[in-house]
Amino acid sequence: MANLMMRLPISLRSFSVSASSSNGSPPVIGGSSGGVGPMIVELPLEKIRRPLMRTRSNDQNKVKELMDSIRQIGLQVPIDVIEVDGTYYGFSGCHRYEAHQKLGLPTIRCKIRKGTKETLRHHLR
C-alpha cells in the first residue's frame, strides 16, 4: 500500500482519527472542538435510512464513474447524514451511496450532523 501525502488547510490540520470503541461504534474523524459541529464517520450502509430514495432515480453513468473513481482513489467527499435519536438519515450523496452498494463495500464515509425530528421533517418536505 502506498503512502499518501496531502496538504491540508490549517483549519483541518488539528483533525484526528480514532479506532472504534469496544461497543462497536464506528471509527470517527473529528476536530478538536469537543464534539461541536459535524463529525466524519465510517457507517455501515445498512445503518443509513434513505427516505428520498423512492422518489428519485440516479444517473447510472454517474454511478459507474463514481465506482471507477472509488476503486482507484477511494471516496473523496463524505455523504451528508442527519442523526435523529440514534437513527441515521442520508439526504445527499445518492450516487456515492449507490456506487458503494454496487461495489459491495460495507461502509461509507459520512458527515454526520445531529438533528431533531423537526429537522428531519424539514428535509422530507
Curated annotation (Swiss-Prot):
InterPro entries according to UniProt: ParB/Sulfiredoxin_dom, ParB/Sulfiredoxin_sf, Sulfiredoxin
CDD domains assigned to the protein according to its UniProt record, in alphabetical order: Srx
Primary localization: plastid
Subcellular location: Plastid, Chloroplast; Mitochondrion
The organelle targeting sequence, given as a residue range: 1-22
Effect of R50Q: Reduced activity. Loss of activity
Effect the entry attributes to changing E98A: No phenotype. Loss of activity
Catalysis performed (reactions): S-hydroxy-S-oxy-L-cysteinyl-[peroxiredoxin] + [protein]-dithiol + ATP = S-hydroxy-L-cysteinyl-[peroxiredoxin] + [protein]-disulfide + ADP + phosphate
Enzyme class, spelled out: oxidoreductase
Top-level taxon of origin: Eukaryota
Keywords assigned by UniProt, alphabetized: Antioxidant, ATP-binding, Chloroplast, Disulfide bond, Mitochondrion, Nucleotide-binding, Oxidoreductase, Plastid, Transit peptide
Name used for this protein in its record: Sulfiredoxin, chloroplastic/mitochondrial
UniProt lineage: Eukaryota, Viridiplantae, Streptophyta, Embryophyta, Tracheophyta
UniProt gene name: SRX
